[in-house]
Amino acid sequence: MNRSEKPQLRATTVLGVIRNGKAALGSDGQMTLGNTVIKHSTKKIRRIQHANLITGFAGATADAVTLLDRFDEKLQAFGGQLERSAVELARDWRTDKYLRRLEAMLAVVSADKALIISGTGDVIEPEDGIVAIGSGSMYALSAARALIRYTDLSAREIVTESLKIAADICIYTNDHIVVEEV
């Protein structure tokens, strides 16, 4: 690494699944700095009780916590309306000079809705009720789609098994998995 290069903080695979009226969101616990694992049990999931939903983040931790706080404020301002709050956060993200520099993504699930709020201020609602962000997201997403299609596993079981598969493939993902349900 060149001395002028800033070491990149990498971490995370976050996966959310809605199935049979239940939603689960999970993540691994690994955080790396450059090519070194610096923590194995980072908490990347937050439950927002007053809105009955779960959020997960990928990217710079301080940036993600800032966005989570802003998202919680929007949820309170708009009476827990998930989509409206996400759109308002995205609007702020695009127009605010400070927020535009934040390097993070959010995954949000409720019992009937799954959203990704991207680092560019986009709000994405996947058609299949599966959200995946972070370094191992495509591995976890692929596994989750296969498990939904070919098994009767619960949302929690799909998230857990998919994250284990991602951990077997992605060097920035470990098997210290935390899953929450709504």
Swiss-Prot record:
InterPro entries the record matches: ATP-dep_Prtase_HsIV_su (IPR022281), Ntn_hydrolases_N (IPR029055), Proteasome_sua/b (IPR001353), Proteasome_suB-type (IPR023333)
Keywords of this entry: Allosteric enzyme, Cytoplasm, Hydrolase, Metal-binding, Protease, Sodium, Threonine protease
Residues in the active site?
12
Q: Which Pfam families match?
A: Proteasome (PF00227)
Which top EC class is named for this enzyme in its record? Answer: hydrolase
Catalytic activity reads: ATP-dependent cleavage of peptide bonds with broad specificity
Q: Which GO terms describe its cellular component?
A: HslUV protease complex; proteasome core complex
Where exactly are the transmembrane stretches of this chain? none
**How is the protein's activity regulated, according to its record?**
Allosterically activated by HslU binding.
Which sites bind Na(+)? 167, 170, 173
GO molecular function terms here? metal ion binding; threonine-type endopeptidase activity
EC number, UniProt record: 3.4.25.2
The processes (GO biological process) annotated in the record are: proteolysis involved in protein catabolic process
**Would you say which domain of life the source belongs to?**
Bacteria
Query: Where is the protein localized?
Result: Cytoplasm
Q: Does the keyword rRNA processing apply?
A: no
**Per its database record, what is this protein's job?**
Protease subunit of a proteasome-like degradation complex believed to be a general protein degrading machinery.
Q: How does it assemble?
A: A double ring-shaped homohexamer of HslV is capped on each side by a ring-shaped HslU homohexamer. The assembly of the HslU/HslV complex is dependent on binding of ATP.
Q: Which family does it belong to?
A: Belongs to the peptidase T1B family. HslV subfamily.
Protein name from the UniProt record: ATP-dependent protease subunit HslV
What's the name of its gene? hslV
